[in-house]
A protein has these predicted regions:
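Core nucleic-acid recognition elements
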Residues: 1-150
């Protein structure tokens, strides 16, 4: 079972504003962009409401994340890899009694604000600016990160 929770703002204005300026060189009518962490939790079974609340509290997460919109792009660790953050966070959850969690991973969702809906070409154009291609990959399907886990 996969749960996806919203997190806090991922980039401070110090990091976000220069990124916005670089994106605007490729996408001139881009007005703004926002960033938000999200947490993907792969659990062995469904979690009840109390377990979900406790899990959100440990992660510092908000409510379940809505499905990805057409003006958003998520950046996650590359498929088939486990980030150092994931290893440590999963260990912490297990030490807190959450043995039901197989793995937890963190990503960033970038939301692009523009008068017009972004095209696939625009999203593909700015994607290389958003991630380190050695360890991360942009995705429109966060569920694919856990496809190889049984």
């Amino acid at each position: 079972m996969l749960l996806v929770f919203r997190g806090e703002t991922a980039l401070s204005d110090f990091r976000r504003l220069p990124l916005l300026a670089r994106c605007q060189t490729l996408w001139p009518n881009l007005d703004d962009l926002t960033t938000e962490y999200f947490f993907m939790v792969h659990a062995k079974r469904s979690l009840d409401a109390a377990e979900q609340n406790q899990l959100r509290q440990i992660l510092g997460a908000g409510p379940e994340a809505p499905s990805q919109k057409s003006n958003q792009l998520a950046v996650c660790p590359r498929s088939g890899t486990i980030s150092p953050w994931s290893s440590k966070a999963t260990d912490i959850l297990h030490n807190c009694g959450f043995d039901v969690v197989k793995r937890v991973e963190r990503g960033i969702v970038y939301t692009f604000l523009s008068a017009a809906q972004p095209t696939t070409a625009q999203l593909a154009g700015v994607a290389p600016l958003l991630h380190d291609r050695m360890i991360e990959a942009p995705t429109r399907n966060v569920e694919s990160l856990f496809e190889h886990i049984n």
